[in-house]
């Protein structure tokens, strides 16, 4: 299994563009990939070293950019430096007062012509593809581990089965001595874990399972299911049943597939419908092909892509029937107008609208959608689900994508803001003690404002007049 490191000036570490850079050759715009190795130092930490090289933090500058665009032709900046700049870092570790750069940090590449990521992991080949079929070296072992993890998280079977002493010891280390095992695996703890993010849990799963596509798909499913399932009713072992069925059925593990679906059908009909719709839906072939065609890819990036793609296929509220593999949109009637008392029309639940995870998380959910519209994928848990002002929301977004502004503007700015792309608007109806963030997707041909509301995960329209009556002018946008 590969190891992750903080960013330092080693030649084996590099930054790689996430989207194509563009150069102009003979009057034509040509896309190409850009990258640079970290031994190309321009401005790194002056006080902290790692493994004999200077460490990088937010603001560190990597000299120059390499590409396949042709020698001396780099996106119209061949006369300049074409440098790369670290934009985000660790949320917990700092160097010289700034977050340390680590695997996955966002990087502005080639003088910010495109965005990329820092890679500080030495990867081994991930999957082999022969005749478009999966070929897992550890499939049986990994599936056993997946079922074992499910047993570990089931209160009744906590010490049944083949559980290693190391795993038992890990559980005793993290459980409060005053807690019962029932309390330890309670919904309350699961919900707290969700609020604190699940990246640590996923890292543990990766460590137990190893490096393979089954792990990636399982973690992608768990990420998405955490976001859409009602955790007041659903247990984490049921989520793992869903992930198990989703990744086992398409690759021919019929026994495991059948048992997981039986478990779900008996306990959690809604989650059974999710699994069934993913496996049998029209979108599955495309996802499956993407997995099979990915050789030597980055595991975490693939997990994020899988959860992002599945997030579009699974509705925020799962009905008991009539699920398809397509994006699900169902007309609903919501009391009070989706988070407030304003007038709306043509309201539908839409899985493209990210539903807020907490009562105060509307700003974070809108932030996730704003970044997603710019092809940057960060979850609302990472952004932070506390009450958010326009200034603090803009500051949060600037940690992942530079250029966001939060300002109070006049009503006349509606069309100018909509010309910048999607933007966040604070809605504040009469009598409310706090406002409510919504995403404005634009204005349609009839002059109606298109709203993505995270309160229930709904999309609706408002007349321009009605919108201006409850919009208090506080806005977050990227000019």
Curated annotation (Swiss-Prot):
This is Cysteine protease effector 1. It comes from Escherichia coli O1:K1:H7 (strain ATCC 11775 / DSM 30083 / JCM 1649 / NBRC 102203 / NCTC 9001 / U5/41). The gene is cpe1.
